[in-house]
Amino acid sequence: MDYFDINIIRTLKFLPGILLGLTVHEFSHAYVSNKCGDTTSKDQGRITLNPLKHIDPLGFVMLLVAGFGWAKPVQFNEKNLQNPRTDIMKIAVAGPLSNVITAIVLSWILALSYRIHPESLYTVLAEVFLYAIYINWGLFIFNMLPLPPLDGSHLLLNYFRKYPGLYEVLYRYGTFILFGLIIGSVFLKINLLPIWPL
């Protein structure tokens, strides 16, 4: 078996975790935004666990090829929220929090399986679970970085609205900083971000 075959097999083991992590993440944003009074996500059919509704084709390919990517962002109208300032933070944290919950549940299932059948830890299915756990923790850490357009930025920028000058700087240059960190992580092979190698 050559390197290409091994890499394909490894990528296939990553796929379920990627699909699960991205789907749960975006579904949670959509669900909470709808609960907070804005029906945009509901109208767009985003309150679903169907991966096809959340996966961005280019972002998904980039994730497989380069180790980083993105899903379709959940849109919401701030004017429709019941309490815009706090609701924006709820919507932002919903995605990363859902990844933490997913990782914990998968860890619990894997631990339970090991207690019942210790040899199950050495199966392909166990590898898929481990990758999924790793991916969901990675999504949580990555998305909580306080850089636009990541979820963590909404928490930080919402606070810095009181300081217009600083808010503008963070909003304007945050994306460039994030892009620079990604480039450094991928092409310079420096772990500046929690990006998983595929």
Question: What are these model-derived regions, one by one?
Answer:
Residues 1-198:
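Hydrophobic transmembrane alpha-helices and their immediate loop junctions
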